[in-house]
Structures are given as C-alpha cells and as structure tokens.
C-alpha cells in the first residue's frame, strides 16, 4: 500500500500582524486522506495558517503549495485552488436572503457553471448527507446554529473539494448543538475526506 501523498505543503511560512509574528517559520504538510487536528492557545496562529492556505490571509514569506502549485495572487490559479479547498468558518456566513438550497447551489452555478437542475440535485444529496433535506426551502434565520453550520458544510462540499478546512466550526454554537456538527465531520472523516481542523473539542481531536 502506497504512503499518503502530501497535498498541501507549507515551507518556512511566516506571517506578522504589525509587530506581532503569528506564523514563525512554519514547515509542515497535510496528506491526502488524512485528518489533521491543530490545537493550541488562542492567538497562536492556528486560524491564520488555515486562512493562509486559502490565501484569505496572504503570508509574508515562505511558500505554500496545493497539489504542487504555489499559492499566490494569480487570480485564475487561486480560483482553481479555492475550488479544491473547501472552508468552514466559526461563523456560518450564509446568505440570509437565499434559501438553504440556493446557498448550497450558488457557488457551483456561478463558479463551475453547473446547470441549475444538476446543482439542485447535487445539493439535495448533500443536504441529505448532513440531515437537512427537509429544510432545503427554509431560510437561514429559520434554522438553529447547528443546522446553519451543517448547511455551511454542505455548501463547502458542493464545490467537490479535495480538502476541507474547518476553523473552529463549533466555537460559535450552543453546547447542545455541537454534537450534531461533530457527527457530520466524523462522517466525512470516515468517508476518506482530507481534513484540517482547528478546534478546542478535545474529544474530537483524540479520535
């Protein structure tokens, strides 16, 4: 059996905000099919590393590559890389004026030019996967925090990414809603999804 291939590689990455250096000469890699959990104190650069991978927070020096291609400001390359790397944030960032279904289908239709019927079919499969198929025509304000975060996961999966980044996905949730989101993440991990997770949920991290 061949060893997992490094899909994302960080090499001597540095990032500062003013005089505060958040990422200091970080070198690491994340392999296909693996789940990596990043833990540490607040302000230690965990979320910044995730955002640097997606170029949401450009790094100052060093290199980050995704599938061998450097992460830079080249628009065409960056769009392709962002399609391959899905991200789920602390806040759900759903569009309040769009239904759950339209939130999930928006990016495939706009970016991948997927036909509406095909995008809707794919979205319903994903909503079923996260247990929300019966809520497809509701709006975000009609859902609980846990349900909104599960929609956010389905939305990220709709782009058919090769890697999923989770930036403290349960930190903004009430305690009783945390488990439903972690259950979806466990299901993704069991399915072989490559995942990089920043979390304070130590029980999930130990798994």
Question: Can you name each region flagged by the protein language model?
Answer:
Residues 6-10, 14-207:
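ABC family nucleotide-binding domain
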């Amino acid at each position: 059996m061949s060893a997992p291939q490094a899909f994302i590689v960080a090499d001597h990455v540095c990032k500062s905000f003013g005089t505060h250096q958040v990422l200091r000469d970080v070198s690491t890699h994340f392999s296909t099919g693996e789940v990596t959990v990043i833990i540490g104190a607040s302000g230690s650069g965990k979320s910044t590393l995730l955002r640097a991978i997606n170029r949401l927070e450009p790094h100052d020096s060093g290199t980050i590559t995704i599938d061998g291609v450097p992460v830079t400001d080249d628009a065409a390359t960056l769009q392709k890389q962002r399609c391959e790397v899905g991200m789920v944030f602390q806040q759900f960032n759903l569009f309040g004026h769009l239904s759950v279904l339209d939130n999930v289908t928006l990016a495939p239709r706009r970016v991948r030019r997927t036909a509406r019927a095909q995008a809707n079919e794919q979205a319903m499969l994903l909503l079923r996967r996260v247990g929300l198929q019966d809520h497809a025509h509701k709006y975000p304000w009609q859902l609980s925090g846990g349900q909104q975060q599960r929609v956010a996961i389905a939305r990220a999966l709709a782009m058919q990414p090769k890697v999923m980044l989770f930036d403290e996905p349960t930190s903004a949730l009430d305690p009783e809603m945390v488990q439903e989101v972690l259950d979806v993440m466990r299901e993704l991990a069991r399915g072989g999804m490559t995942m990089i997770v920043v979390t304070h949920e130590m029980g999930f991290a130990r798994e």
